[in-house]
Structure formats: C-alpha cells, structure tokens
Amino acid sequence: MSKIFVNPSAIRAGLADLEMAEETVDLIARNIEDNQAHLQGEPIEVDSLPEDMRRLQLDDTKPSGPGEIAATGESKCQEDFQMDEAEDPALLFQSYLDNVGIQIVRQMKSGERFLKIWSQTVEEIISYVTVNFPSLPGKSTEDKATQTASRELKKETVSAPSQRDSQSSKTKVAAQTASGPPALEWSTANEEDDPSVEAEIAHQIAESFSKKYKFPSRSSGIFLYNFEQLKMNLDDIVKESKNVPSVTRLAHDGSKLPLRCVLGWVALAKSKKFQLLVEPDKLNKIMQDDLNRYAFP
C-alpha cells in the first residue's frame, strides 16, 4: 500500500487559512451583533410580494368594512411616523453636536488646521441633518414664520433676479475674504453638471446593479433590494444619486461610494413598494452610518 506524503508547508498554510477564516467569521458576527442587531432574521424576497402591500393583513383581527379598513390604515401610518420620547431627534442631534465638539478639540490638539477641520465638520453636520430630518410626504415641516419668509423670498426672486445674483456673488467674495470654511464653495460646485462625476457614479452603480443589499423592514426583520428592482433608467438613478450628501465629492475624488445608502435614498424617493416595506427610522440610521464610514473615514 503506497503512502501519501503531505508537505509540512502546505499543512501550515492550511492551518493559517483556517485561523483567518475563524477570525473573519468572529468579526462579522461581532459587527452584526453590535451595529446591525435589528437586521437579524430571515430575509424576504421583494419580488415575491404584491405591488399593493396594503392588501396584506398582518393583524389577527381583520377589519369588517371599508370604513374600518381606511381607519386602520390611517392609524397605522400615524404609528409609523410617531417617535418615542427616548428617540427625540432634537436630543439625538444635541448629543451628536456634543460629540462633534469633542472630536474638533481632539483634532486641534493633534495639530490639524482649524479650517480643514471645520470644512469637514460642516459637511458632516449637513449630511446628518439631511438624512435624519427628512421632510415627511404630505406633511409640512415649516412653521408660519418659515412659510412667511419663504413667500417673501419667492417674491424677491421673481421681482429682482439680478439683485439676487449680485448678492450671491458678494456673499461668496466676502466669505473668501474672511477665510471662511472652504466647504461652502463645494456646495456650489455640486450643483454644476460634471460629466466625469456622473460617469464615475454610473460606473460604480452599474457594477453593483444586481447586487442585493439588506434593509430593515417594518416587521422588525430585513428584506433584500437592489438597483435593478427600481426599474429606472441608469441616468435617472445617477441624477437622483447626486442629491445624496458627499456622493458628488466622493465621485469627484474617485473614491468608493456608499452604494447601500445611495440605493436607500433613491428607492425612498422613487419606489412606493420600498416605502411601504422599509422602516424609516432604522433606514436613516443605516444611511448615516454608511455616509460617515465612507465620507469621513
């Protein structure tokens, strides 16, 4: 009977691979437990669900009449958009600003320039506000004073457009003279169409067009979704993606984009099925975490 000899180096390499695999599994498990505990569960396929999700009855007691069905749906929508006192956005925002202040002090102690720190902080705060304070559909978040100011601003825009342009240019010159944060100039540059930026965004989205990402559902589980299920033209997806904070800057620098955040942003704006499936508060937290990880590593 012949003997099979195994090279000791191959055994050592195999053991090293096993150790690396175990460490990778442990790391993934810790990440899921620490940061994405709400995403645990069996994912569901969105394609297998009906277009009109409101036909599904998740309660044990079924409404008897059309009026009761309408009342139940209305109360359910109100519950979805209500937030507990423990999750008051104002308190969360105050805590976030406190952490930002601590981070600025640490960076200044390490010797970084204030203008560089401030420009990054401005973009980070704008990103946080945009993601965590979205305007709810069908509801106005403006108070009477804000509405009055908006109407007055609109009248001034219609009556004197040249005056507005002049004031805008003066403001920009004054900001440059005072050596203000350079992040203000970036917001203006974002509004301009840059073919190279659009090409970079389209390239990264196209590479992951059929890749499915996990999103939190209203049933405390998860569901899978991808760009292909949007059933949108790639140009339209790119156009909407440019509204995501920091995405245009990342594409301009050739950096990797937070595609799950981009998909969630576009789907929340364009897909009714996605709006009915996703849990808004958890989605906002996931999108903010993705933006912080990619835009401010």
From Swiss-Prot:
Identify the stretch(es) annotated as Disordered. 137-198
The annotated regions of Polar residues compositional bias extend over: 159-179
Q: How is it modified after translation?
A: Phosphorylated by host PKC and by an unknown kinase.
Residue numbers covered by motif Nuclear export signal: 49-58
Q: Where is the composition biased (Basic and acidic residues)?
A: 140-157
Which Gene Ontology biological process is one annotated for this entry? Answer: microtubule-dependent intracellular transport of viral material towards nucleus
Instruction: Indicate which residues form the motif Nuclear localization signal.
Output: 211-214
Mind telling me which InterPro entries this protein's record contains?
PP_M1-like, PP_M1_C, RABV_P-like_C
Which residue stretches belong to region DYNLL1 and DYNLL2 binding? 138-172
Residues modified as Phosphoserine are: 64, 162, 210, 271
Record family assignment: Belongs to the lyssavirus protein P family.
Q: What's the protein name? A: Phosphoprotein
Species this protein is from: Rabies virus (strain silver-haired bat-associated) (RABV)
